Amino acid sequence: MNFKNVKVPKGPGGGVIAAVVIGGLSLYGATHTLYNVDGGHRAIVFNRLVGIKDKVYPEGTHLMIPWFERPIIYDVRAKPYLVESTSGSRDLQMVKIGLRVLTRPMADQLPEVYRSLGENYRERVLPSIIHETLKAVVAQYNASQLITQRESVSREIRKILTLRAANFHIALDDVSITGLTFGKEFTAAIEGKQVAAQEAERAKFIVEKAEQDKRSAVIRAEGEAKSAQLIGQAIANNQAFLTLRKIEAAREIAQTISRSANKVYLSSNDLLLNLQAMDLDVKPKK
């Protein structure tokens, strides 16, 4: 059999396969030559030939060379970082201090941050510099001063931390002390001091109240003496005053008896006060 004259027919799916291959390559190129940088982020590019490029790419869509380049995206928004550290104060009291810092990478220094620290720069840098700073600052204050001068302590910690973090191209937006915990002995001493202060305030209040009561008693006695003097003068000058007092007393007795549950029988003429014998026509003494 002569195979030279045999013709192999072309497959009907050859064009479809070529189209699929071209489409796949196009899709691969489109997805691997474009990348997006979201809001609050920045990107740097690693090139297989030159390494990390010095350019920092802002938010938006950017081009890159497939396989030769890949983007490294950083979140440049401030994030909180919490640390707790136990340090000794100047008076040798052990203090557990909690610190909260807001940090972010310096956007224009991202290539250097990646070269020296990588992507997990926070875990590499912040624990060490925060612990060291806390120990240095707490050692300058007594335990009581850490409470009374808390704002000054926080300001000193922020000043030192800002300088230390800047050496690693990290910016600190805020530093705050979240908690102070002292040893049992110091805590007991503080509570005892507070109780003593409260007792002193209570004793002071009692003394002041006694003085006030004393002054009130003196004023009341003076008022009663003056009242007795005026009553005596009124009786001496006009007997009608005594008659008025008897009538008022009779009225009070009548009201009391009327409200009483017991049955009492009195003369309606004088209520046992000898009102009938009163001389109501009293002339003032001359």
UniProtKB/Swiss-Prot annotation:
SMART domains: PHB. It is found in: Mitochondrion inner membrane. Residues 1-12 are mitochondrial matrix. Its main location: mitochondrion. It comes from the Eukaryota. Prohibitin probably acts as a holdase/unfoldase for the stabilization of newly synthesized mitochondrial proteins. Belongs to the prohibitin family. Component of a prohibitin multimeric complex in mitochondrial membranes. This is Prohibitin-6, mitochondrial. It comes from Arabidopsis thaliana. The gene is PHB6.
